[in-house]
Amino acid sequence: TTIQNMSEILDEEHYGMFSVKDRFLDIFSRMLHNNQISSFAPILLHGPPGVGKTSFVSSVAKALHRKTFKIALGGLDDELELKGCSISYNKAQPGIIIRNVERLGTFSPVIHLDEIDKLGKISDASNIEGILLDMLDNDRTNFMDLYLDIPIDLSNAIFIATANNIE
């Protein structure tokens, strides 16, 4: 992966958006220069609906040669959907992160946290927000899925959140 290749993919798939593309390419170039493309700080893309945030996340994944999946936070109202449910419960299963990591076959996906701004509108979003903070922390090596009950290393995952409104 080179900056030129990334730039070509982003330019080919997104007309305009120059400041956003330049910012991402700046981040990529610093990470490549430091050989740290895996340790990527979480990023927030915000703007009105329909400007291309979701497709831009897909293009970033393509430019980095990574698989991607989306978590629709706007409709998420149960923390167990993120964190999984203990195996001792009936119909227990891993959380959405682990299910998708398993489905994609990689611990290095681009994870799209869609509509992160909608969390505040959920009646009991505080537990979900706490789980997200834990996942997005700089030390992402100890994410606990309740179903597996072992620490999961998410340090190679890239988290990109999108929001329509950040106020």
Segments the model singles out, each with a brief description of its role:
Residues S88-H112, D145-P151:
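Conserved alpha-helical scaffold flanking the Walker A/P-loop in AAA+ ATPase domains
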Residues H112-D153, I158:
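Conserved catalytic/switch belt of AAA+ P-loop NTPases
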Residues A63-Q93, N100:
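AAA+/P-loop NTPase substrate/partner-engagement loops
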Residues G74-D77, S88, I116-L119, N164-E167:
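Conserved nucleotide-binding/hydrolysis micro-motifs of P-loop NTPases
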Residues G47, G84, E115:
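The Walker A (P-loop) glycine that initiates the GxxxxGKT/S ATP-binding motif of P-loop NTPases
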Residues S38-A41, L64, K83, L104-P109, ...:
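Short loop/turn elements that form and flank the Walker-type P-loop nucleotide-binding site
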Residues T2-H46:
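Pre-Walker A (pre-P-loop) alpha-helix and adjacent loop at the N terminus of AAA/AAA+ ATPase modules
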Residues Q36-L73, E102-R103:
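Walker A/P-loop
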